[in-house]
């Protein structure tokens, strides 16, 4: 689950971290009122969407008049913002953040993720603030400094100081950075975060550090104990198909291809997508129906896949371990008949009662192709959408 910038900064405030004075707004008049409350003669107004690249897309602007605030609000509220991180439709802008301006002398980067290899929260810091950290990692990886947090003892002040030295900070900046580092580490653990990013973390002309931006992702598996955060989730930013899938405990991620994929098991699903690519096709989605591939779940999976107008064929790849393939075949047939599938459906079954499952599919009389192997299934799917 992702948070908006204004929500992330509210958490920063709660943990004692320095952020600009800012107010979230729903209307143009609220934006003007917010500027009056903040004071000053210049403000930054930002579209609130779950995507990066807002500045380059026109979703962040420095304004010096109240009319400028109104104009920006009227331009974006109720519209969709398209950035390099969104699809062609973009994401809806329902809120704006009006903030005071900061006198920036230098921009830094500070973020944290869970490193699966070391099984520890890892902080990353760089002098290259204000740009995509992925680009820095690719072009100048030596400019990224890391600190791994031992889960037994937690983040230590010396780790913050060490990062501060590597960033070239001095004087009171070192103490400020260490406080931010320790606060973020506590926030990361207590709120079950999976990603945290401040880009940029700025040094002002007065030698103060301020969290100028904030990005937070929360582990969706921890929502049962993060109910307050779950309550502020902005579902308008989520893909409708992904929300539908979550209701049925299906793991679905929309992509931009033409071959819908339905698979049981995340690893098998990724392998299926790879082999579709290998044979010249493009998957329209990642969909893992899990171990309980019942008729009801398969039916909902078909509905989700076919709600994408780009889907020209559906590839079903099921390994029958706990679940028998003949029952899966019955479920696929029932789902195809109920949903009224009009595109070709290619089914590859392997494992428990696979031969019986393929026989049931072949005798169904529906537009279902029983593939002999995964390679055959991928070739049939690519052929069905007009590929070679």
Curated annotation (Swiss-Prot):
Enzyme class of the recorded protein, top EC level: ligase
Cofactor: Mg(2+)
Binding site for Mg(2+): 199, 213
Top-rank taxon, per record: Bacteria
Gene name of this polypeptide: sucC
Co-factor binding comment: Binds 1 Mg(2+) ion per subunit.
Source organism of the structure: Psychromonas ingrahamii (strain DSM 17664 / CCUG 51855 / 37)
Keywords attached to this entry: ATP-binding, Ligase, Magnesium, Metal-binding, Nucleotide-binding, Tricarboxylic acid cycle
The keyword Nucleotide-binding appears for this protein: yes
Residues where ATP binds: 46, 53-55, 99, 102, 107
Cellular component aspect of the GO annotation: cytosol; succinate-CoA ligase complex
Annotated family: Belongs to the succinate/malate CoA ligase beta subunit family.
Job description of the protein: Succinyl-CoA synthetase functions in the citric acid cycle (TCA), coupling the hydrolysis of succinyl-CoA to the synthesis of either ATP or GTP and thus represents the only step of substrate-level phosphorylation in the TCA. The beta subunit provides nucleotide specificity of the enzyme and binds the substrate succinate, while the binding sites for coenzyme A and phosphate are found in the alpha subunit.
Pathway: Carbohydrate metabolism; tricarboxylic acid cycle; succinate from succinyl-CoA (ligase route): step 1/1
Residues reported to bind substrate: 264, 321-323
GO biological process, one term: tricarboxylic acid cycle
InterPro entries, A to Z: ATP-grasp, ATP-grasp_succ-CoA_synth-type, ATP_grasp_subdomain_1, Succ-CoA_synthase_bsu_CS, SUCC_ACL_C, Succ_CoA_ligase-like_bsu, Succinyl-CoA_synth-like
Source lineage: Bacteria, Pseudomonadati, Pseudomonadota, Gammaproteobacteria, Alteromonadales
Enzyme Commission designation: 6.2.1.5
Record protein name field: Succinate--CoA ligase [ADP-forming] subunit beta
Annotated PROSITE patterns: ATP_GRASP, SUCCINYL_COA_LIG_3
SUPFAM superfamilies recorded: Glutathione synthetase ATP-binding domain-like (SSF56059), Succinyl-CoA synthetase domains (SSF52210)
Entry-linked NCBIfam families: PRK00696.1, sucCoAbeta
Residue ranges of domain ATP-grasp in the record: 9-244
Reactions it catalyzes: succinate + ATP + CoA = succinyl-CoA + ADP + phosphate; GTP + succinate + CoA = succinyl-CoA + GDP + phosphate
Known partners and oligomeric status: Heterotetramer of two alpha and two beta subunits.
GO MF entry, a single one: ATP binding
């Amino acid at each position: 689950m992702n948070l908006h910038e204004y929500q992330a900064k509210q958490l920063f405030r709660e943990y004692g971290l320095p952020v600009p004075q800012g107010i979230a707004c729903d209307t143009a008049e609220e934006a003007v009122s917010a500027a009056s409350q903040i004071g000053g003669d210049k403000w930054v107004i930002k579209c609130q969407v779950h995507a990066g690249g807002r500045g380059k897309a026109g979703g962040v602007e420095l304004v010096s008049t109240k009319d400028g605030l109104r104009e920006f609000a009227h331009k974006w509220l109720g519209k969709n913002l398209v950035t390099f991180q969104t699809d062609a439709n973009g994401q809806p802008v329902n809120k704006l953040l009006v903030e005071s301006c900061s006198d920036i002398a230098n921009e830094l980067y500070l973020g944290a993720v869970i490193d699966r290899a070391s099984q520890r929260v890892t902080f990353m810091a760089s002098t290259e603030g204000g740009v995509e950290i992925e680009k820095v990692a690719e072009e100048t990886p030596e400019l990224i400094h890391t600190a791994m947090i031992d889960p037994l003892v937690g983040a230590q002040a010396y780790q913050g100081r060490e990062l501060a030295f590597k960033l070239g900070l001095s004087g009171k900046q070192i103490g400020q950075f260490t406080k931010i580092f320790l606060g973020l580490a506590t926030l990361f653990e207590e709120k079950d975060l999976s990603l945290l990013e401040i880009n940029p973390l700025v040094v002002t002309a007065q030698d103060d550090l301020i969290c100028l931006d904030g990005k937070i992702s929360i582990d969706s598996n921890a929502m049962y104990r993060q109910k307050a955060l779950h309550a502020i989730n902005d579902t308008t930013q989520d893909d409708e198909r992904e929300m539908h899938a979550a209701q049925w405990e299906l793991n679905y991620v929309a992509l931009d291809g033409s071959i819908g994929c339905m698979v049981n098991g995340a690893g098998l699903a990724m392998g299926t997508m790879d082999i579709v690519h290998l044979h010249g096709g493009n998957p329209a989605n990642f969909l893992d129906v899990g171990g309980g591939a019942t008729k009801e779940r398969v039916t909902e999976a078909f509905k989700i896949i076919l709600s994408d107008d780009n889907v020209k064929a559906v590839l079903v790849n099921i390994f029958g371990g706990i679940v028998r393939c003949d029952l899966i075949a019955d479920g696929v047939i029932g789902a195809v008949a109920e949903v009224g599938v009009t595109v070709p459906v290619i089914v590859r079954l392997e494992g428990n009662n696979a031969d019986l499952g393929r026989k049931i599919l072949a005798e169904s009389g529906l537009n279902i192709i029983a593939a002999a192997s995964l390679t055959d299934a991928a070739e049939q799917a690519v052929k069905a959408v007009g590929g070679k």
